[in-house]
Amino acid sequence: PVDPDRRHAGFSQFIVPTDLPGISISSIVLMSGEHHFNEVTFDEVFIEDDNVLGEIGAGWQQVTAELSFERSGPERILTTAPLLTALIRVLAEQHDADDHTAAALGDLLARLISLRQLSVSVARALADGHSPVNEAALVKDLGTRFEQESVELAADLFSYVDTQTPGYDRVAALLEVGRLHSPLFTLRGGTNEVLRGVVARGMGLR
C-alpha cells in the first residue's frame, strides 16, 4: 500500500512484453519525418509477478537511478557537434571571421568542453556505484539548452556565409536537421522544468 506521507513508496517496476493482449503501439513521427518514439497504451493488461524487475516497492528509486545513466550521457551535449564542426570549417574557408564570430564560437566550445567534463564526472560516479541523480539532471538541463542555443548561433553565423564557400551545402543540410530537432532537445528524457525540480529537491529547496 502507498504511504500518504511517502507518495513514491509502493511503486514497482515490471518488464512488459509488448505482444501482450491490450497493448497498442502507435508511431510518433517527428517534424523531420523521422520515427524515434512511440505512444504506448495499456487496456486491462495483466503482468505476471515473475516480471517484477528489482525489488518490490522500490520502483521509484530504481527509475531515478536508471535515469542518471540516461540523462548524463554525451548524447545530451553532442547532438549538434557535427553541425558546429562543419560550420567552423566553412568559416575558416572564408578567412574573414571577425572578433565577434571568433568570440561567439570560442564561448560555445568552452561550454561544450565544460559540459563534457561534467558528463564524464557523472559517468565516473556511476561507475563507482554512486547515484548522482542531481548531477545527471543538471547535465541534461545545461546540455540540452546548449544544444538549442548552438543551433541558434549556427543559424546566425551561417547567414553571412557565401553560398559558393566549400562545405556550404553540408552545413545547410545539418542546420535544417538541427532546426527541426531543436524543440525536442529539452523534451526527451524529461523536460527541463521537471529536471530543475529534481535539482531543487535535491538541494533542499522544495
Language-model features, listed with the residues they occupy:
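A short core secondary-structure module
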Residues: 1-24
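Short, glycine-/Ser/Thr-/acidic-enriched flexible segments
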Residues: 2-4, 20-21, 30, 47, ...
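Short glycine/proline-enriched turns and hinge-like loops at secondary-structure junctions
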Residues: 6-10, 34, 54, 191
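Short glycine/serine/threonine-biased micro-segments
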Residues: 8, 31, 57, 127, ...
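Structural beta-strand/beta-sheet cores of well-ordered domains, especially the beta-sheet scaffolds
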Residues: 12, 21, 38-43, 183
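A glycine-rich, basic-preceded beta-loop-alpha segment at the flavin cofactor/substrate interface
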Residues: 26, 31, 36-99, 120
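Alpha-helical interface subdomain recognition
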Residues: 68-206
